[in-house]
Amino acid sequence: DNTLGALPGDVVLVSVISHANGNRREEGRIVRILEHTLTSVVGTFQKNKNFGFVLPDNQRILRDFFVEKGKDMDAQNGDKVVATILDYGNEHKNPQVEVTEILGAKNEPGTDVLSIVRSYGIPEEFPQEVLDSLDSIPEEVTEAEKIGRRDMRDFHTVTIDGEDARDLDDAISLTFENGIYHLGVHIADVTHYVKEGSLLDEEAKNRVIPMLPRKLSNGICSLNAGTDRLALSCLMDIDEEGTIVNHEICETVICVDRRMTYTMVADILDGAEAPEEYKDFVDDFKLMKQLSDLLRKKRSGRGAIDFDFPESKIILDEKGRPIEIKAYEHSAATRLIEDFMLLTNETIAEEYYWLELPFVYRIHETPDEEKLRTFATFLNNFGYSLHLTNHTIHPKELQKLLSRIEGSE
């Protein structure tokens, strides 16, 4: 062993023992550990009669960590623990640690997530100065905040999400008048509260779980039913051919009338009797379905391909344990939200393209030319042809091919 008991991240002095030769890399031997950077370890506790060990989750650490009796916090065999390093040991002696936190039993729901969070030092709590900055953010939208915004509160507006959705960040409104669909897609205006360069903004850049304090994500930035909320809205006027004839991107104030789920809306569209509280919205959902079908037909006409791949959904019990795995159902409700969001994205992207403003676009690269030729040859062996134009392929050509192949054996 040429590591001298060093741990990942240690700063070491190395002596070269063999130089690179052909495919063989240069080899060295650690002669001195200059600095230890690892201060704690996450792993599985293993208990013996008079002492214990922590078996590290990090597979780059090839040593177990010794736990002296009385320094294990009464951890049990198989518990996931966080342990502080007391002695780094050496090449002949295992490092010594003290258990400072028990994350839970190894197979207990949630323990795996906590283990990853602790291992990588992912921040869970917000710094106090960030929490203090929330004091200036109101619990409800104030009258002053509504000034200068388009008032959309008189329009029937709904959110449609999964049953387990917590942060409701988009809503839909739709009316039809004189042959024109007036579609509004409203996104919670988080930037009104999280200003660029603010403490909240800087903290959010380094976070995922959660990115923003719950006061924002579950509160004033969540489009909860029955409360005024600030939104950024894309208002689109669409004719009966599915063409946008006018649009506006603006700051609005909205009030969601109902929180709906995909299941509820799908059942209503399938003809189920709507609960009393939703009866005033049945015509809205039918109108949404009508527009969704129109948009989908128009996209299909330009060659769009519907990659309807099967997805799985894991059902958990109240303790977070998986009890069922079932196919994720794509319904008329999920499709209409997909269609409206796609149309919104296209509209906004085109707006900023013509304004020549800096913008982040999601662009799919054209297929590799060599792979296309190989694919075309493969298809020819089965009696199908693929027409290439300028060494690439138009989506419409793929759409036609899939249509011909569908149902064949």
Residue ranges and their predicted role:
Residues 32, 36, 40-409:
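Conserved, carboxylate-rich catalytic/transport cores that coordinate ions
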